[in-house]
Amino acid sequence: MGPIHNYFGVVCLGIAASVYFRPECALYGSRIATFAVLLTGIAISKLLYQLFIYPQFVTPLKHFPAPPNRHWLTGNTGSLLVDTPHALMKEWAKTIPNDGILRYYIVGNMERLTVTSPAVLREILVSKAYEFAKPLVIQQTLRRVLGNGILIAEGEEHKFQRKNLKPAFAYRHVKDLYSVFWSKGTEMTKLIRKDLQSRKAPDDNTIQVRTWASRSSLDIIGLAGMGRDFGSLQDPENSLSQSYEMIFATPGLGTKILFILGMLLGNTTWLAKLPTKQNRLIDTGCRNIRDATRRMIREQKAKMEDPNAAAEVDIISVAMRSGNFDDDNLIDQLMTFLGAGHETTAGALQWAIYALCKHPDVQSRLREEVRANLPPIHGENPGPIDAATIDSLPYLNAVCNEVIRFHPSVPNTVRVALNDTTLMGHPIPKGTQVVISPELVNHMPALWGPDAERFNPDRWMGPGKANTGGAASNYAFLSFLHGPRSCIGQVFAKAELACLLAAVVGSFAFELKSPDAPLEVREGATIAPKDGVLAKFTPVEGW
């Protein structure tokens, strides 16, 4: 926390030692009372230092511009929560002159930097990718749910995991999975139709998109990740699906406040040990998922040992054949694929449906392209699909890219400097936390033009724009990050979204149940509509 705070701690430690060895020095003759007073003094000193002294007099980052009007408790955000202030960050980036780095304070006057230029992004994500890591509190929080897979691993361990998993996510492998994505998309649309047909009132056609998106993406991860159909679409009460419902439930206000306390203390492991209802649900869900993945690994190994069995193309089989992962690490990778993979794609599909409800002209145009180029899926013999067919639809890919740009499922990530370093020549002390925000960068007019904050798939149409959106830099599109810590599954995720969205938009016309209601979001490791997307689905016949 700084020399003043450290000095006070040393003094308190010295007093405590004196009292321990010389009881006659204790307050009121009680060691317990003395230690209680000392601990209270340390806590108060840390709080005063954090709230008042450090940001005003001590911070070594004063040379970076910051917003005015910092509050002693809520910093520059005006919020008692740790949610990233995306709207404020966008305004700061526009109005505060900076050369790529801004400084601000969140609740408790905890200091953060955020990045606004491609040059700084390139430095932190590529050239110095392993000089910055996820903060310990974030690692602890995510590891509990996702295991110590590629998303959490750091340093040499991450390099090892990425090198050995990369072949499983290469396009030459993912293209063979398009048929899996498409089959689940068609299964989902048929089940939605069946659901609508079973309802008594003809105007009862509201669909909760979240549940269908989550179950379809979970089934896809099962098939593509480990060659196993979880059957979540067919069975809403599927144990694996229910486990994730437990884990990803929106945390209550009390949990958020305790998390802030954990951040101030620099450690959140104790939060998981509190006897709260949410912890019990998360522990049960995680235990169920870990037990299930352990069984899957065991069964998959037995299948691979059979000399007569056909070679599997799922991701975990590719990882097994490399021979570089033991069972525990394979379980961690499966936990990561299942949790992070299905949650982000489910969120992306929800955002896609929401965007198409808000832009019916885009929805109609996309439906025309899909129905004109893809085989019907509601006849007796639905036609097959392959990667080349899906990839050849320019407007489908433009819409998917714009959804991912405009509504990044992971709106921000945080990195902490592991050692004293520099960014663009500016000194960055060890422990400095840097917020990298796709939500900010993906909407910057300086990179995307004056319509940066408008949903516009046409920006991805035309010569040379299919992969860039016409942006001024490839670092303008930050949804999958860049460099060695970029999302290893981005090709997989984009293909999955394209197949699911094509199946839905080709089969239904949809509009929001309450089009004028304000959008509320649920923000955690990912961001999605708070209560899901409630949309009225109307089957469109003839396809």
UniProtKB/Swiss-Prot annotation:
Gene Ontology CC annotations of this record? membrane
Per the UniProt record, one Pfam family is p450
Cofactor(s) needed by this chain: heme
**Any Gene Ontology biological process:** small molecule biosynthetic process
Give the main location: membrane
Where in or outside the cell?
Membrane
> EC?
1.-.-.-
Biotech applications: The sphingofungins A, B, C, and D, show a limited antifungal spectrum of activity but are especially effective against Cryptococcus species, fungal pathogens causing opportunistic infections in human.
Q: How does it sit in the membrane?
A: Multi-pass membrane protein
Residue positions annotated to bind heme are C487
Does this UniProt record's set of keywords contain Kinase?
no
> Could you tell me what this protein does?
Cytochrome P450 monooxygenase; part of the gene cluster that mediates the biosynthesis of sphingofungins, bioactive molecules acting as sphingolipid inhibitors via inhibiting serine palmitoyl transferase (SPT). Sphingofungin biosynthesis starts with the PKS sphB that produces an C18 polyketide precursor 3-hydroxyoctadeca-4,10-dienoyl-ACP containing one delta-6 desaturation and one delta-12 desaturation.
Q: Which family does it belong to?
A: Belongs to the cytochrome P450 family.
Protein name from the UniProt record: Cytochrome P450 monooxygenase sphH
To which species is this protein native?
A: Aspergillus fumigatus (strain CBS 144.89 / FGSC A1163 / CEA10) (Neosartorya fumigata)
